[in-house]
């Protein structure tokens, strides 16, 4: 008598469920910090999952997964609280060792990273955990180097790891917990020897840029260590728009190449198989250490070791279980890495490969050459499909030709990367071998040329506002069904995939409907990083934006969240100097005009003096001269007067006293649109102009007759 067995709807993998519950626990805890009402859906998820396990009588598994779920909450709380410890010390002495030096783009300004930081207040010393971000102003030479011990008087504050409902992932990634600023003339520098790894990186950087040039040398350095500070904006944009920016970051692709080479040679040696495994473990751990335990490198290393270990134990390797184990290990130690784009892309690419390649493997190709070609093309397609939602949601674009260019570029890169690693080792031993760098130079030049050509093609990339959460979930569900991890057969499976993808496309379409400004009045908004005006013609102007690197990144994120692709102008009133390259790149990306006074501190870097309109980095720049702009300076603030679409505007910068208000009435004797974006602004006449307090004002008339 045959036993009646019922096929499971989903191919059950405990590690996958555990990884998913850990992820949900971390995400819910982060959301709860921003909105306490998120406790409700977090509880609903726990109850629904518990009921499911009770029905299936999986009591032990329920206990394990609920423990992991709550563990996700716990480790997230500990992480956030570690960064939330209040620290604001006036006039303290900070002493720290420089671990990183980056030129900010402002003249004489550098961003440093301090480690082993000690602060001293009234002879009481306190050691700080983590690292500290330090901005140094007025640097007159390049005397600051990695390894130096720097001390100086400052005010130090802690970094909020969750800010504006989002995770400051860049700070978290580098374990930066505090920030401060120092004046170069008030610091003392004690030269110190850098570590072996720091010497290795510095020497490699110098060798590559010297023998391969700034462009190729910078790319090669990024490929080796994941540090993209030497790559200029144009190169970065070209690689991004062509769809090969992933090769610039040390990732699983790089680990895979090195692992394959080492594994091949170890198999040729007459060594015990466990000694070979130990050699692989030591090599991969060392590589992770050099790459500062980048999540993508750690993920790839864990999966490589799992693959070898299962073979040693005579077991069958399961890709989904392997990637889930890697996810669990990384998130247990660094839970907020879930919000790191590199982490997401690394797992997305592998997930795509696992799910899509299962479909390709069903075709039994007899011709070995054809099979290898199909395999290579399939991997490129699968990885691009796997990371498609992540790229759309994180970067706001889709590279149209990414699959095709990766088919061409990856084989070239597969030759370039191992050669670069090997030749770089020889050059580190002796510069006599530097001539060998001509080979990787030629290969990378070829990749750059291909990237430039593809990015210049029509419709090379499509700007989007992202796919959104619902469409992303539906997209990956369709991938799981296609990969055979959901047991549906024949037409039902096909219809399920089509229906799921159609729903995903529908939500993507809804998510990408641009924002329309339909007010007949003016919208004035004040934000930590900018103030803005929407005119009655639906023009959008941003005023005195935060020009720091963090400010620009945050502003891009805010505009993306508001579904704004184009703005009409950046208006600068305050005379603060800023990085001309950062602002120019921003203006180019958002197709906007820059307005600033002729005597603005940054005007010489942006403009050709004497012309009203000039070209700079493909971005149109305008500046006001004194014929079209007047400024009125008062005790505490300044007012700038200018025209937008033949309408006269006054924009204030500063908080005015009552005495100032009386002077403003005497100076301005005609109807204007008055915009103030400072807190506690005063009334002009008998009307309250604007009290920002970080609120959004819709349809608020700003016409004030004075």
Regions found by a protein language model. Give the residues of each.
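Hydrophobic alpha-helical segments
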Residues: 1-30, 306, 310, 422-452
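Membrane-interface helix/helix-cap signal primarily in integral membrane proteins
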Residues: 2-8, 67-246, 553-560
């Amino acid at each position: 008598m045959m036993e009646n067995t019922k096929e499971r709807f989903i191919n059950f993998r405990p590690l996958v469920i555990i990884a998913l519950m850990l992820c949900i626990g971390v995400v819910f805890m982060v959301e709860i910090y921003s909105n306490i009402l998120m406790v409700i859906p977090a509880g609903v998820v726990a109850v629904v999952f518990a009921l499911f396990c009770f029905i299936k009588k999986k009591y032990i598994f329920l206990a394990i997964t609920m423990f992991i779920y709550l563990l996700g909450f716990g480790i997230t709380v500990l992480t956030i609280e570690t960064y939330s410890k209040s620290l604001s010390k006036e006039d303290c002495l900070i002493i720290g060792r420089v671990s990183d030096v980056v030129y900010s783009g402002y003249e004489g300004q550098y961003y440093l990273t301090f480690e082993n930081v000690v602060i001293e207040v009234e002879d009481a010393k306190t050691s700080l955990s983590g690292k500290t971000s330090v901005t140094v102003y007025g640097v007159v030479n390049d005397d600051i180097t990695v390894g130096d011990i720097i001390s100086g008087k400052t005010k130090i504050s802690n970094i909020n790891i969750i800010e504006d409902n989002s995770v400051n992932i860049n700070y978290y990634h580098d374990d930066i917990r505090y920030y401060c600023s120092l004046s170069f003339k008030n610091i003392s520098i004690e030269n110190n020897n850098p570590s072996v790894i720091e010497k290795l990186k510095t020497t490699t950087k110098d060798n590559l840029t010297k023998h391969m040039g700034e462009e190729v040398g910078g790319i090669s350095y990024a490929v080796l260590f994941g540090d993209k500070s030497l790559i200029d904006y144009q190169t970065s944009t070209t690689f991004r728009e062509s769809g090969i920016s992933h090769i610039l970051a040390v990732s699983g692709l790089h680990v895979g190449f090195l692992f394959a080479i080492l594994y091949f040679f170890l198999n040729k040696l007459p060594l015990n198989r466990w000694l070979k495994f130990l050699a692989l473990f030591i090599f991969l751990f060392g590589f992770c250490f050099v790459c500062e335990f980048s999540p993508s490198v750690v993920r790839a290393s864990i999966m490589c070791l799992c693959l070898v270990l299962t073979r040693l134990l005579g077991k069958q390797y399961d890709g989904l279980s392997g990637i889930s184990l890697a996810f669990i290990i990384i998130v247990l130690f660094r839970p907020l890495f879930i919000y790191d784009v590199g982490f997401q892309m690394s797992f997305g690419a592998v997930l795509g490969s696992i799910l899509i390649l299962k479909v390709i493997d069903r075709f039994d190709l007899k011709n070995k050459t054809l099979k290898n070609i199909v395999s290579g093309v399939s991997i490129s397609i699968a990885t691009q499909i796997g990371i498609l939602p992540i790229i759309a949601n994180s970067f706001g674009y889709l590279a149209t030709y990414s699959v095709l260019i990766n088919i061409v570029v990856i084989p070239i890169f597969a030759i370039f990367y191992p050669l670069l690693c090997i030749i770089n080792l020889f050059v580190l031993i002796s510069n006599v071998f530097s001539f060998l760098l001509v080979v990787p130079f030629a290969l990378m030049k070829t990749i750059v040329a291909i990237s430039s050509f593809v990015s210049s093609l029509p419709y090379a990339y499509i700007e989007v506002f992202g796919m959104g959460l619902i469409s992303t979930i539906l997209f990956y569900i369709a991938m799981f069904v296609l990969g055979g991890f959901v047991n549906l057969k024949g037409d039902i499976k096909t219809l399920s995939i089509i229906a799921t993808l159609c729903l995903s496309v529908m939500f993507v379409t809804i998510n990408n409907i641009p924002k329309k400004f339909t007010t007949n009045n003016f919208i004035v908004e004040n934000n930590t990083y900018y103030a803005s005006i929407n005119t009655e013609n639906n023009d959008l102007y941003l005023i005195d934006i935060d020009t720091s690197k963090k400010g620009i990144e945050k502003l891009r994120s805010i505009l993306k969240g508001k579904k704004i692709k184009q703005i009409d102008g950046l208006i600068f009133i305050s005379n603060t100097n800023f990085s001309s390259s950062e602002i120019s790149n921003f203006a180019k990306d958002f197709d906007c005009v820059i307005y600033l006074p002729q005597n603005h501190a940054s005007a010489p870097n942006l403009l050709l003096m004497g012309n009203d309109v000039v070209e700079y980095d493909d971005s149109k720049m305008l500046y006001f001269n004194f014929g079209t702009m007047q400024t009125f300076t008062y005790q505490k603030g300044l007012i700038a007067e200018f025209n937008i679409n033949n309408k006269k505007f006054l924009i204030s910068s500063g908080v005015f006293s009552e005495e100032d208000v009386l002077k403003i009435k005497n100076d301005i004797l005609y109807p204007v649109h008055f915009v103030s974006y400072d807190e506690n602004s005063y009334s002009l006449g008998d009307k309250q102009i604007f009290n920002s307090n970080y609120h959004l004002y819709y349809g608020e008339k700003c016409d004030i007759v004075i």
